[in-house]
Amino acid sequence: MPVEGATTSSYNEKTFWYYPWGKSVTHKDVDIFAKEGTNVCSSTTGLAVFCGYKEMGGNVVLVIGPKWRLHYYAHLKDIKISCFKWVSRGEIIGTVGKTGNATNTSPHLHYSIMTLIPYLWRIDKDKQGWKKAFYLNPISYLETK
C-alpha cells in the first residue's frame, strides 16, 4: 500500500474506471484517503523519472518499475525525492496532500499504474475504453503486494 497505515477501507474500489469524472472524463486511478502529511511510499522499485508539478495532478512523482510500468503518485503535499533517483519499494517519496485539481477535496493520494507496452486485448467500448490498453487496475496490484 503506497500510503502508510492505509487499508482497503481507505479507498473505494469502484472509483477505478469510473465515469463521468470531470475534465479527465473517466477516473483511471484509485484515490487513497489519509490525513494530510501522511507518508507516501513507492509501491515498486524503480527510477523516479518525473518529480514536479502538473496542473491537474499537482505535486507528482512518476516511477518506472519492472515490466515497463509507470507508477503515478499525484496530489502530494510534498515531494521527498529528486528526479532520476533510484527508489526502493517502501521508500518514502512524498506526503499525502490535495494539490492540483484536488484543492477542494479531502487529502488523498491519486495512484495509477500504466504500461508502456499496450495490452490490446483489454480495449472495450467503455468511455475511453481504448485507454484500458495502457491503464492497469491499481487495486489488483495493491491486493497482491
Regions found by a protein language model. Give the residues of each.
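Acidic, glycine-rich catalytic/binding loops that coordinate metals and/or anionic ligands
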Residues: 82-91, 112-145
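A generic structural motif
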Residues: 35-37, 68, 76, 91
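Solvent-exposed coil/turn segments that connect beta secondary-structure elements
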Residues: 37, 45, 66-68, 99, ...
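Active-site loop architecture of trypsin-fold serine endopeptidases
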Residues: 96-110
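Surface-exposed, glycine-biased beta-strand/turn segments
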Residues: 1-59, 89, 98, 135-145
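Generic beta-structure capping elements
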Residues: 10-11, 66, 76, 114-116, ...
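Small beta-barrel nucleic-acid-binding modules, principally OB-folds
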Residues: 22-32, 63-67, 113-125
